[in-house]
Amino acid sequence: MAKKKFSAGLTVLSCFLALVIGFAAAFFLYTYIKRPTGGDAYISGDLSIHFMELGNNYTGDSIYIKAGDTDILIDAGSRADSTDTTAAYIDQYCTDGVLEYVIATHADQDHIAGFAGSNSSPSMFDRFTCETIITFNLTNQKMETASGNPTLYAKYVDQLQEAVDAGATHYTALQCCNNEDGAQRVFEVSDGIEMEILYNY
């Protein structure tokens, strides 16, 4: 009788260990071997949200949203040279070259560097036709360095103005929240999909 208990216990333990090893192997394969490159994508019906890898070793934010036929870019990453990778990723989904909405959440480098661009890597404003640009209302960023050179923020402002001169409509988040000057707090971006602009300053 004691032998049966030992055999049953050993069988249960063996099954449990096999299960744990199987889960660990599957996790390892997905995480380190078969994981798709380019960032994470979440898709539901006509809405897909892509958290993009930026093509460099720096952290930064850049989110692409596809809502029906509407293309939305939120922030443009950590370095100006990340626009090559970011634009190539977006081009897979944005086939007409038009970003209906571009949003810059705040003026820190890890959010606006791709909008500023560089000599070797054009701004996201140059790479796509931008229809509506929504930006932060306040910043403590300076236009010049102590030595008098333009800052990244100054380059961003120049690129933003060029996009507006090329036909983009520009609103601040505060204008959107207050429904001022043609701005809206809520934009219908696709059938049944709305984008609400929040203002938290």
Which residues make up each language-model segment?
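Long, low-complexity, intrinsically disordered N-terminal extensions of eukaryotic proteins, enriched
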Residues: 1-2, 30-34, 101
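N-terminal hydrophobic or amphipathic segments with adjacent small-residue motifs
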Residues: 16-20, 71, 161
